[in-house]
């Protein structure tokens, strides 16, 4: 084959034209692959087998997730498990365009990224940088999983704000992935908290948690390490679980109503919601 498959494929994104983008978080996964929807190879972005370099413009560092900004024809890489940055490339060519680190800083792979709950977070991403999602109104939401935080930027990397969720989580962190609600304003953010085994529904304007659902377990509606999250055009939610979870769950959209129970365990039966 004219390409090297990731040692551990991680992150998949479908472009508007149907192309499939795949990252990897295994050893040597310093590249991203692009295929047609039928599996025909298109290109490799980056070079496989390279070491960490969060300032490189030629390779990446175990990309966790890919998100495509249709209007700008750009792909955002959450880069990643090895590098500590957001990287942006051209969708049509894969050409490198720009990058930035935490708070919009230039990444520094030698910096101290110690995280102590209740203290200011590190000035560099602690990592893994696990999501980088552009919104409809020109912002980019970045999951710094190991520091329990979401940082918000403009698309040019200008820092806007930071919010910490479940700051005493430690271990593998609380901010694993986000998805937006599908209304034009993207009023809500859905946050997958893989360490605490739940999903948080967040008001995007205030960034406050409105409601959570889920708890640890293997039954329907419970989670073992919810790793990734997505929404469809009907606002249904899809979650994937890693480790022993190893499954996909679908949650049907029930509309918007007042919150009566802020922290709900399994979201069933529906007549109790």
Model-found features: residue ranges?
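Eukaryotic scaffold repeat domains enriched in small/polar residues
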Residues: 1-273
């Amino acid at each position: 084959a004219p390409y090297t498959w990731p040692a551990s494929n991680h992150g998949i994104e479908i472009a508007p034209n149907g192309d499939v983008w795949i990252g990897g978080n295994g050893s040597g996964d310093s590249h991203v692959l692009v295929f047609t929807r039928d599996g025909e190879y298109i290109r490799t972005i980056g070079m496989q087998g390279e070491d960490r370099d969060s300032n490189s413009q030629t390779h990446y560092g175990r990309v966790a997730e890919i998100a495509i900004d249709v209007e700008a024809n750009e792909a955002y890489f959450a880069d990643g498990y090895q590098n500590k940055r957001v990287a942006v490339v051209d969708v049509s060519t894969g050409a490198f365009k720009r990058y930035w680190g935490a708070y919009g800083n230039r990444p520094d792979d030698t910096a101290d990224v110690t995280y102590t709950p209740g203290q200011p977070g590190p000035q560099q991403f602690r990592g893994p940088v696990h999501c980088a999602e552009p919104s409809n109104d020109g912002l980019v939401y970045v999951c710094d999983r190991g520091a329990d935080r979401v940082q918000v930027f403009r698309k040019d990397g200008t820092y806007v704000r930071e919010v910490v969720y479940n700051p005493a989580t430690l271990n593998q962190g609380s901010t694993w992935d986000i998805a937006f609600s599908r209304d034009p304003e993207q009023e809500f953010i859905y946050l997958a908290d893989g360490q605490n085994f739940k999903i948080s529904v967040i008001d995007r304007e205030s960034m406050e948690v409105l409601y959570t659902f889920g708890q640890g377990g293997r039954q329907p509606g419970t989670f073992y390490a919810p790793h990734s999250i997505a929404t469809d055009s009907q606002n249904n939610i899809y979650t994937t679980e890693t480790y022993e979870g190893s499954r996909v769950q679908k949650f049907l959209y029930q509309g918007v109503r007042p919150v009566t129970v802020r922290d709900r365990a399994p979201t069933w039966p529906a007549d109790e919601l």
